[in-house]
Amino acid sequence: MDGYWDVVVSSLQDIYNANEVIPFDDELQTKKLNFLNMSKDQLQLHLNTFQEHMENVNRVHRILDNVRSNLSLMLNQSREEKSEENTEDAEEGEGTRMALSQGKKAVGKVGRSYWTSEYNPNAPILVGSEVAYKPRRGSADGEWIQCEVLKVVADGTRFEVRDPEPDELGNSGKVYKCNRKELLLIPPGFPTKNYPPGTKVLARYPETTTFYPAIVIGTKRDGTCRLRFDGEEEVDKETEVTRRLVLPSPTALANLARK
């Protein structure tokens, strides 16, 4: 569920940024213009402005559709979990009810991480876990995308994950079938060790759900990583990324999860 909420927050930030670049509000001065007295170049300039404004508004409409979709999924998932809990309470005996009252809860299938190191704890992968998924193309340190685990199958080494971002047409994100070598677990929030400067990592680029190779420049007091992403157009540009969204590079990981 956290993955859906992260997408909602990220989408709302995208809408805010879109308004900062090209305000959604109508320009009063534009309404007062007399287009009949303008030259062809002036008309073309205004036409370009209107087209950019329209494209920006249409893009925001698609983002809002995605927000509504993710909020709906969150609400449905919450209802399903509540329904399952009520069913369990009705079917289980007094002993199970006592266990539940003490905070004990049955756990479904548990997935196992393949990639692990001192900078990315070997925590179990569960339904709802956030992961970085590598599409089956390119190198291990190519682009990875943030997904949410929908299903743990087989013996915990295969998964179904969903891209929470809609496609270019605004349709729901794709569902992928993958194995544990194609996933990197995003730490669920517990403390993680800081990377030393010079460490090669995969980090989620701000305002996207895509992970790219980067080099750690340093770490701030709050744990935020200062990074230099590979391929940045601006030379020596530093970017700050939340620690939990900075993952060890698969090619640099020394410890592999045991079967």
Swiss-Prot record:
GO terms for cellular component: ADA complex; nucleus; SAGA complex; SLIK (SAGA-like) complex. One of its GO terms (molecular function) is methylated histone binding. The keyword Cell membrane does not apply. The record marks 205, 212 as: Histone H3K4me3 binding. GO terms for biological process: chromatin organization; positive regulation of transcription by RNA polymerase II; protein localization; regulation of transcription by RNA polymerase II; SAGA complex localization to transcription regulatory region. Changing residue 229 to A: Reduces histone H3 acetylation. Residues 75-102 are annotated as: Disordered. Residues 163-165, 207-210 are annotated as: Histone H3K4me3 N-terminus binding. Keywords: Chromatin regulator, Nucleus, Phosphoprotein, Transcription, Transcription regulation. Residues 229-232 are annotated as: Histone H3K4me3 binding. PROSITE patterns: SGF29_C. The SGF29 C-terminal (also named tudor-like) domain mediates binding to methylated 'Lys-4' of histone H3 (H3K4me). Chromatin reader component of the transcription coactivator SAGA complex. SAGA acts as a general cofactor required for essentially all RNA polymerase II transcription. At the promoters, SAGA is required for transcription pre-initiation complex (PIC) recruitment. It influences RNA polymerase II transcriptional activity through different activities such as TBP interaction (via core/TAF module) and promoter selectivity, interaction with transcription activators (via Tra1/SPT module), and chromatin modification through histone acetylation (via HAT module) and deubiquitination (via DUB module). Belongs to the SGF29 family. Component of the 1.8 MDa SAGA (Spt-Ada-Gcn5 acetyltransferase) complex, which is composed of 19 subunits TRA1, SPT7, TAF5, NGG1/ADA3, SGF73, SPT20/ADA5, SPT8, TAF12, TAF6, HFI1/ADA1, UBP8, GCN5, ADA2, SPT3, SGF29, TAF10, TAF9, SGF11 and SUS1. This is SAGA complex subunit SGF29. The lineage of its organism: Eukaryota, Fungi, Dikarya, Ascomycota, Saccharomycotina.
